[in-house]
């Protein structure tokens, strides 16, 4: 990893998210996909995923222009050695991070790289996400947790658009999705929610409860459609008008999150390469 001094720009810099507990459900920063499957092949989704290391923080991001990646704000410390590698394999080379721009209120950050990516970049999903839509989560958490050399992906079904989730930031507006064929466990923070191969959300939190088998079976995503103007302003990315309207907002404390049945980790790895059970 290259050593780099980078600058952080924001209207306000808030503390990184920390684990929170509450009856029935708690949400904490999401970190690795376990019991999932490899992100493979040459495609927009595999080519645009980013492995981020800034200070002692390991996260995931997504290339949305040749020089800009989007991730979660809580992934960005105030200083430290900063590097990013583009692509779904650890064979990808790290490059330094030039700067990070933090969203003033949402758990979003933009990370600028000095060299243009030669691989694909991903477009934003062209509509506001609605309950019942299906997508894929992807992330690099398995690299730190299990030594997996390939980014992992699982399936997500959006359940609700929520606020007041038991977490450090109860004002956050989030897409709540149940995870199947894998689960979020610690490095996937900031990773993408893809719908039809386009970026619909950025992972902010996942379930963190007393039963470890339930951890990571629900993820909360920042809906990028609701922040398209901010993204376009700083990156220069052309974003077409977003279709539809945001889904009804549900109070997640008054209407607690349903946590799916446990999904214990049953995958394995050979030589560091992940082998999912599905």
From Swiss-Prot:
Family membership noted in the UniProt record: Belongs to the peptidase S1 family.
Signal sequence interval, chain numbering: 1-32
Active site: 74, 123, 189
Keyword Ion transport in record: no
InterPro entries (UniProt xref): Peptidase_S1, Peptidase_S1_PA, Peptidase_S1_PA_chymotrypsin, Peptidase_S1A, Trypsin_dom
SMART domains hit by this protein: Tryp_SPc
Keywords, ordered alphabetically: Disulfide bond, Hydrolase, Protease, Secreted, Serine protease, Signal
Organism: Corynebacterium glutamicum (strain R)
Coiled-coil residue spans: none
Disulfide bridge positions per record: 59-75
GO CC annotation, single: extracellular region
One BP term from GO: proteolysis
Peptidase S1 domain location: 33-236
Cell compartment(s), UniProt: Secreted
SUPFAM superfamilies per record: Trypsin-like serine proteases (SSF50494)
Name of this chain's protein: Uncharacterized peptidase cgR_1176
GO molecular function (one): serine-type endopeptidase activity
KW Cell wall biogenesis/degradation (keyword) present: no
